[in-house]
């Protein structure tokens, strides 16, 4: 099952050229870029691991692409995403986020159902990869 989080997630994987164009766009808007990775793809997992430091004053897309290539070398078997942060007054938030690397096999999720008080049914989404493997060995 293909993980769909962030911009472009329903499109085919972006090429490096397309990623660089998005980075160029973000830099032209004055947004700071950063690279994050995870091996826990749960839809509610918003706290991915930060790769290196945020690239605040970078004006050259090649520097961002270099960091992406380094992250791919170290975390090739997991998910890697790029974020653009708009620090302007009134926004101060992530304005663009997209996945740039995926594991070869994405096993997907399952729905766990549990009965609560008064026959209330509670649902939880769990990842097959997280249930089967410890952190750091999932992909």
Swiss-Prot record:
Pfam families: RuBisCO_small (PF00101). GO terms for cellular component: chloroplast. It is found in: Plastid, Chloroplast. Its main location: plastid. Keywords: Calvin cycle, Carbon dioxide fixation, Chloroplast, Photorespiration, Photosynthesis, Plastid. One of its GO terms (biological process) is reductive pentose-phosphate cycle. Transmembrane segments: none annotated. It comes from the Eukaryota. GO terms for molecular function: ribulose-bisphosphate carboxylase activity. Heterohexadecamer of 8 large and 8 small subunits. Belongs to the RuBisCO small chain family. The basic functional RuBisCO is composed of a large chain homodimer in a 'head-to-tail' conformation. In form I RuBisCO this homodimer is arranged in a barrel-like tetramer with the small subunits forming a tetrameric 'cap' on each end of the 'barrel'. PANTHER family: RIBULOSE BISPHOSPHATE CARBOXYLASE SMALL CHAIN 1, CHLOROPLASTIC, RIBULOSE BISPHOSPHATE CARBOXYLASE SMALL SUBUNIT. RuBisCO catalyzes two reactions: the carboxylation of D-ribulose 1,5-bisphosphate, the primary event in carbon dioxide fixation, as well as the oxidative fragmentation of the pentose substrate in the photorespiration process. Both reactions occur simultaneously and in competition at the same active site. Although the small subunit is not catalytic it is essential for maximal activity. This is Ribulose bisphosphate carboxylase small subunit. It comes from Cylindrotheca sp. (strain N1) (Marine diatom). The lineage of its organism: Eukaryota, Sar, Stramenopiles, Ochrophyta, Bacillariophyta.
């Amino acid at each position: 099952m293909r993980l769909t989080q962030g911009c472009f997630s329903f499109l085919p994987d972006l090429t490096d050229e397309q990623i660089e164009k998005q980075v160029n766009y973000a830099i032209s808007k004055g947004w700071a870029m950063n690279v994050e990775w995870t091996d826990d793809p749960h839809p509610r997992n918003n706290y991915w691991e930060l790769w290196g430091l945020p690239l605040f004053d970078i004006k050259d897309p090649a520097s961002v692409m270099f960091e992406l290539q380094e992250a791919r070398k170290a975390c090739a078997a997991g998910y890697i995403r790029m974020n653009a942060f708009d620090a302007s007054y009134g926004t101060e938030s992530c304005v663009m986020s997209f996945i740039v690397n995926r594991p070869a096999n994405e096993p997907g999720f399952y729905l766990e159902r549990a009965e609560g008080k008064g026959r209330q049914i509670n649902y939880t989404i769990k990842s097959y990869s997280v249930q089967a493997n410890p952190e750091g060995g999932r992909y």
